[in-house]
Amino acid sequence: MSKRTEQLTELLAPVVEDLGFVLWGVEYIQGRGAVLRVFIDHADGISVDDCAAVSHEVSGVLDVEDPIPGEFNLEVSSPGMDRPMFDITQYVDYIGEDVQLKLLAPVSGKRKMTAAIVAVDGDTLVVELDGETLRVPYSQVDRARLQPRFN
């Protein structure tokens, strides 16, 4: 997680939580057409009205605190079924599910893989790929997203 993303998460988490939601994660894409994506979650799901309410409150905080120079678009949404993963603690609730991983360095010769989440062991993600158990240091995970199974 970049320093800016960490700062935005720290700034926005209390705002989102005060509205009764969980801040699932924050993505900031710099450059022309910059975008700040705020993912919110709730045990009962997320509605469009929920996103609008959070967007309104988050916009106010961003206007006052001004943590991002220049113009950007704010997007507030549910993380969805194929949710991006932002923190190693988020994997615990999805043990047994598949996750797409993009790694900074290869593990067992692979930088990209879709594997089943087996466990979280401290700062290590344990996954199973083709019958082989792999230990992936979380510091090596560049991006991760749940891969829903449709049976």
Curated annotation (Swiss-Prot):
Designated name of the protein: Ribosome maturation factor RimP
Pfam families: DUF150_C, RimP_N
Database matches in InterPro entries: Ribosome_maturation_RimP, RimP_C, RimP_C_sf, RimP_N, RimP_N_sf
Subcellular location: Cytoplasm
Transmembrane segments: none
GO biological process, one term: ribosomal small subunit assembly
Signal peptide, first to last residue: none
Family of the protein in this entry: Belongs to the RimP family.
Organismal lineage: Bacteria, Pseudomonadati, Pseudomonadota, Gammaproteobacteria, Oceanospirillales
Coarse class of the protein's main subcellular location: cytoplasm
Role of this protein: Required for maturation of 30S ribosomal subunits.
GO cellular component entries: cytosol
Species whose genome carries this gene: Alcanivorax borkumensis (strain ATCC 700651 / DSM 11573 / NCIMB 13689 / SK2)
Designated gene of the protein: rimP
Key word Transport present: no
Keywords assigned: Cytoplasm, Ribosome biogenesis
